[in-house]
A protein has these predicted regions:
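Soluble non-cytosolic domains of exported or imported proteins
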Residues: 23, 27, 86-90, 226-234, ...
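Extended surface/linker regions that mediate inter-domain or inter-protein docking
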Residues: 95-98, 111-112, 121-231, 239, ...
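Short amphipathic alpha-helical segments at helix boundaries and their inter-helical linkers
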Residues: 258-275, 335-360, 449-453, 661-670
Length: 672
């Protein structure tokens, strides 16, 4: 009887909690919709085929998707349109609070659009003017976090534990798409991912105790005679040093010792040894980056990462394995202060080698930022009279990028405007001669036609890099590798190219393509692609978004989808004019450009573009989007970049020695 009574009370409480707050709807939300929304979204007008007239306040009763869309548009500032009457912040906040509360009552996963703010493609929704406006009293860092290892770290470190074992399963996924891959919020370990990792751990454990294994203290655990308690303890210490990278605590030593003893009683000491190593290999500290912080919170409620946490954070920011230099510095007490960290990062970044491989994550930033390696994934037939080799194009472009990183001056501006590119040339290690510039392939003709070089053009190392005529090439965005990566199989893709400029250089936002939209451009050989695109995007409901992308992307109609410079398209002179607009930056807005070279020249001079570039570098190295609490970090990084004449090393040093990187909110503050 008591149980039935309690159950009835619980149902009543839940029902009360789930009831729609209709009073607040009629008092706050309905007048808001009437004032700011219904002029365009009533039953008669229905802009975007959306009517909010008579919408029910019952979010869970058939209106979930519509309310979720309204919340998203209001939350991200996309509605009302900028030229329409705007609600004040208090009005917007009140309506958002009501919708948020009703969405939460549905208990539907992903009901809140604000969850998207942790995803890399939504970083630009943080107000740029506020980030680079008035500085704050202090940095408010992210909460403590467990950051699942990216596949490259796992694939580099795990095989070494098993004496370079092969055949390990891939249990760690990476997100698809053109955004940064290693975002902490994007990954977790579930049962499906843990199963192959457990299989890997068993294989590695067996290899660590195999007869040909090097470590005697681990092999002692599987010899004929059962090990003594001290031998088990020594095996645990060795396993922790090799696998976790530290000595076990007293609690861990006792716990794993008891585990081995229980496993031995059940299956014998050999099986127990493998189970012991498998358990250590599956510890969260092995599969996650631990960034919890230590010590007493400061006056702002922040705690600093421990020296060991800093060492691993720096290692994985610049490399795909623990860097001995950072681990030693932590052990020697030389990562205790911000100045210590800055000095260590500065020393590590001093890489003047041709390949620029001391810190592979630096080059990887530019791969992921520009996304040019994707050219390898875009299938194309060979052009008439030419050759399309996307892998060669990517390698050629990376030779230029390596040069720019080694020079480390005006890095962004140079990458956006350079006319000097390599053609069939890359840095290679030559036996007994070291790294030298060598041909990518010996049988390369007529590969050079991708760069509009004549079929009889004479190739030579002494002619590298090739300086192209002014107006023909201008930076990475006019290189065939980037153009091919941001194209279709048979045509250019000015929409995606324009979106890249809007988001990666101008810091703007573009909504997702609405469900049900047919985004195909009609085929018509006698009409230029620019005009064919205009036919399908000119409608008002389409142009609202396409005006942010198309005027920026159509300048690249100067090139065909292979990346070759062209003067005619569909038998007509190419129109490569464009417009930089809707940026909120007076010196850029309304700027008409004659083609890609002029656009790149304008963008490369912009302080705003530099700041957006800094924001992307922040996301890459921090593994998260920036918040207003990171204002000081971003401004300091931009200052470092400018004062160093555009040094990416100085920018990286500033980020990795910042409070945003080294500090975490204390658990209490994070909870509050």
């Amino acid at each position: 009887m008591m149980l039935r009574c309690c159950f009835s009370i619980l149902i009543g409480v839940l029902s009360a909690q789930a009831a729609v707050d209709e009073a607040a709807f009629w008092k706050t939300v309905e007048p808001f919709l009437d004032t700011y929304c219904l002029k365009c979204h009533d039953n008669e007008t229905q802009k975007g085929k959306l009517s909010l007239e008579g919408i029910s306040p019952s979010v869970a009763d058939g209106n979930l998707e519509m309310w979720r869309m309204v919340f998203e548009r209001l939350h991200f500032g996309e509605m009302p349109p900028k030229k329409k009457k705007q609600p004040n912040p208090a009005e917007r906040a009140a309506v958002l609070a009501w919708i948020r509360g009703e969405l939460l009552k549905t208990q539907e996963p992903g009901a809140l659009a604000e969850e998207k703010l942790t995803e890399p493609q939504f970083g630009n929704y943080v107000d740029h003017t506020a980030l680079f406006g008035k500085r704050r009293s202090h940095v408010t860092p992210a909460p403590p976090r467990l950051w699942r290892l990216r596949p490259a770290i796992y694939n580099t470190t795990m095989p070494r534990l098993g004496e370079r074992i092969t055949g390990l399963a891939n249990g760690l996924n990476a997100v698809d798409g053109s955004d940064f891959k290693d975002f902490a919020a994007a990954y977790f370990l579930d049962e499906a991912a843990a199963a192959p990792l457990l299989g890997n751990a068993k294989k590695i454990a067996a290899a660590m105790t195999a007869p040909n294994a090097k470590d005697r203290s681990l092999k002692t655990l599987v010899v004929d005679a059962p090990p003594t308690a001290e031998q088990v303890a020594e095996g645990i210490r060795t396993a922790f040093r090799k696998i976790v990278g530290r000595a076990p605590t007293a609690e861990e030593l006792g716990r794993f010792g008891a585990f081995h003893q229980a496993a031995s009683a059940t299956g014998g000491h050999v099986a127990a040894a493998n189970a012991l190593l498998t358990a250590i290999l599956m510890q969260p500290e092995v599969l996650y980056r631990m960034e919890l912080g230590t010590g007493e919170p400061d006056e702002h409620g922040r705690v600093r990462l421990s020296p060991r946490e800093v060492a691993y954070a720096l290692s994985y920011a610049l490399d795909d394995r623990p860097v001995e230099m950072f681990l030693k510095a932590a052990a020697d007490g030389k990562l205790a202060t911000t100045e210590d960290v800055a000095a260590a990062v500065r020393e590590r970044l001093a890489d003047d080698t041709l390949l620029q491989e001391l810190n592979p994550r630096v080059l990887q930033f530019f791969r992921e930022y520009f996304h040019y390696p994707f050219a390898r994934e875009v299938f194309k037939d060979a052009p008439k009279g030419g050759k399309h080799e996307p892998d060669w194009l990517v390698r050629d472009l990376e030779t230029t990028v390596r040069d720019v990183l080694r020079a480390d001056k005006a890095v962004l501006s140079t990458l956006l405007t350079t006319r000097r590119f390599y053609v069939n040339a890359q840095y290679k290690s030559v036996k007994r001669k070291g790294v030298q510039l060598q041909p990518t392939h010996t049988k390369w003709w007529p590969y050079q036609t991708a760069f509009n070089l004549a079929p009889d053009w004479r190739w030579g190392l002494d002619r590298q890099p090739v300086e192209f005529p002014e107006g023909e090439r201008a930076g990475v965005l006019t290189h065939p590798a980037w153009l091919a990566a941001w194209s279709g199989n048979f045509d250019n893709h000015p929409v995606q190219r324009g979106k890249w400029i809007r988001t990666h250089l101008l810091g703007g936002t573009v909504p997702d393509v609405p469900i049900g939209v047919d985004a195909r451009v009609p085929d018509a050989e006698h009409i230029t692609f620019r005009n064919r695109l205009k036919q399908v995007t000119a409608a008002a409901e389409c142009w609202r978004c396409h005006r942010k992308m198309d005027p920026l992307g159509v300048v690249f109609e100067r090139y065909d989808h292979y990346g070759r410079y062209q003067r005619r398209d569909a038998g007509q002179p190419v129109d490569a004019t464009g417009l930089i607009d809707r940026t909120g930056v007076p010196e850029l807005d309304g700027k008409h450009v004659s083609g890609p070279a002029e656009m790149m020249a304008e963008l490369s001079k912009s302080t705003h573009v530099e700041q957006v570039f800094v924001r992307h570098a922040f996301r890459y190295f921090m593994g998260r989007n920036e918040t207003l609490g990171d204002t000081n970090t971003l401004q300091a990084a931009h200052d470092a970049y400018r004062k160093s004449s555009g040094s990416f090393r100085a920018l990286t040093e500033s980020l990795l020695a910042s409070d945003s990187f080294l500090m975490r909110q204390s658990p209490k503050q994070a909870k509050d």
